Amino acid sequence: MQSSSLGNADDPRFRQTHLFQMLVKVINTSAENATKTAIATSSTSTPSFVDTYSTSSLLGEEGRMVMIVVIGAMFALVTSLGNLMVMVSFKIDKQLQTISNYFLFSLAVADIAIGVISIPMFTYYTAIQKWDLGYTMCQFWLCIDYLMSNASVLNLLLISFDRYFSVTRPLSYRPRRTTKKALTMIACTYIISLILWPPWIISWPYIEGKFTAEPGTCVVQFLQTNPYVTVGTAVAAFYLPVTIMCILYTRVYWETQKRQKEFGKLQATQTWASDVVDRPSTQSFRNSKMWKKVKKFSRRSMKRDVSSTSIIKSSGSMRKKNNQDGYVEDSVTPCTSSRNSKRKSWLRNCTGKSNSSSEDSSEAVAMNLDDTSLSSSHFALSGSRRRNISPPCTPMPTNFEDEEQTDAGASMRNGSARFRSRPSDTGKNNNSDTYTVLIELNDEGSRPSVRLSSCEPYLDEPISTRNRSKSDCNSEIDERRHSLLNKQSPFKNGRILKNFSSQERKSEKEQRKNERKQESKAAKTLSAILCAFIATWTPYNLIVCWEAFFPNTVPNVLWTFSYFLCYINSTINPLCYALCNARFRHTYMRILRCKFKAERPTMNQGYVRRN
């Protein structure tokens, strides 16, 4: 029975049946499952170190790529938006459209190109650790990268030169600094960068006759093959500009400190002079050294302020015009129809008084006693202009402090000097009106007097009216002079100096205050930009010079970080403007609030005064 069964199992016909094949399949499947279970059990008890390392390495590589992409995208976005805000601020705010800010605008253009092109491509190259975008795209990225980076450096150098000349040579440099010249200098920065980098990046493989860059890499070839060219470009692009910028910034800093000290001394001198002028007038005080210093100070102020004029000018009553012969004539303002208004006009013309401020009133009696300038004064009036003028009155002595005269007048004391107007072509006509200025300089203790020549008749008035007006004018002038002399204290006239220069000192103080404020803002901005530039660019240039002579000695991570640090400089620059310039901060806030329209002038002015 058993043999029969075995025989039947060995029968070839039985092996070909469907049942036998199913049994074999089941047996094989069970054995395979048992083997897999045993392997799985042994693997669980003793895990493989290689499999574990591979899994963690894969996860770490993916995490590293994600982190690099996120950081690079964040910096690219911040750099692009920050520099775009600088450009928009320059466009929408008229107060920011200055020549100095043109350089900042150019710097923002270079930085925004770095944020849009250079940072994203470098992020991609660093994340996948190979370059698979092709040779043409590699050359394009390198050319734009080095071009804009070097243009950014040269713009910083241009800003430093602009600040240096503005502080050290304000009178000669600022008037000649125009928008056209600024744009020319900005164009030069890009032209120099264009000559320095892109041609050599593209042509260097052909100059050497071979491509030495490894496949999957994107580098500047001469930075790897020629150490001398590498050092030369580093010196031209970084070391030389940063050295010049440091020297210029040091000079700007010391010049600013020097001006602040000089301004403090000037304020102290002006306060001391004002106190001295208010002291009582005594002969002993006039002979003292302190009074001589006051005289010297007042003469300098007078020479500086009134050296350009040689006539008695009254604000609102005398205006310079050109006649047909090319001479400059001083026409008196037209008088009104009423007789009282004419008298007041004559009185103002003779006394040099007007309804202006104390500064204008003081300027009315200010004269330059230089012979040449006085002799060239022209008072001839053509016949066609005579209906629009008021006649000068008869001679009236005008008190004038001797300490306010210039050195030319000091040499003519104890005598009288008559300065006549230069005859003009119309002087041959009897109808032309001329008058002279008579200055009498007496003893040291007395006051000199200024006299105007006799009045000419007013043509539109009848003879009786003319005579009456002249007598009224003379009487009113005498009364005016008598009342002024009685009201003056012994040293009251010494306050002419104070009245003359008070308004000017105030305006000069405000002007210098604004200049110091602008210089301080510019110095802060320059210092912040310079410090950020040195901190972000120094590591890369040190590594490049080291790698030129000692290749493959610096870790790749350190080289990548130093390269990316140069890009961060373009991110920091807009923040430097905002931190150091309140106007940029204000405009940034306007942009963030989407207020692109111009604000009311009163609001802008109030904001400027607060800052």
From Swiss-Prot:
Residues 1-67, 123-140, 203-227, 547-557 are extracellular. It is found in: Cell membrane. Residues 307-317 have a biased composition (Low complexity). Disulfide bonds join 138-218. GO terms for biological process: action potential; adenylate cyclase-inhibiting G protein-coupled acetylcholine receptor signaling pathway; chemical synaptic transmission; G protein-coupled acetylcholine receptor signaling pathway; G protein-coupled receptor signaling pathway; G protein-coupled receptor signaling pathway, coupled to cyclic nucleotide second messenger; positive regulation of acetylcholine secretion, neurotransmission; positive regulation of protein localization to synapse. Residues 89-101, 162-181, 249-525, 579-611 are cytoplasmic. One of its GO terms (cellular component) is plasma membrane. Glycans are attached at residues 28, 33. PROSITE patterns: G_PROTEIN_RECEP_F1_1, G_PROTEIN_RECEP_F1_2. CDD domains: 7tmA_mAChR_DM1-like (cd15301). Pfam families: 7tm_1. The chain crosses the membrane at residues 68-88, 102-122, 141-161, 182-202, 228-248, 526-546, 558-578. Keywords: Cell membrane, Disulfide bond, G-protein coupled receptor, Glycoprotein, Membrane, Receptor, Transducer, Transmembrane, Transmembrane helix. Residues 503-519 have a biased composition (Basic and acidic residues). GO terms for molecular function: G protein-coupled acetylcholine receptor activity. It is a multi-pass membrane protein. Residues 299-364, 377-432, 446-477, 500-519 are annotated as: Disordered. Belongs to the G-protein coupled receptor 1 family. Muscarinic acetylcholine receptor subfamily. The muscarinic acetylcholine receptor mediates various cellular responses, including inhibition of adenylate cyclase, breakdown of phosphoinositides and modulation of potassium channels through the action of G proteins. Primary transducing effect is Pi turnover. Enhances the release of the neurotransmitter acetlycholine in cholinergic motor neurons, which in turn positively feeds back to depolarize body wall muscles and allows for the maintenance of normal body posture and locomotion. PANTHER family: 5-HYDROXYTRYPTAMINE RECEPTOR (PTHR24247), MUSCARINIC ACETYLCHOLINE RECEPTOR DM1 (PTHR24247:SF265). This is Muscarinic acetylcholine receptor gar-3.
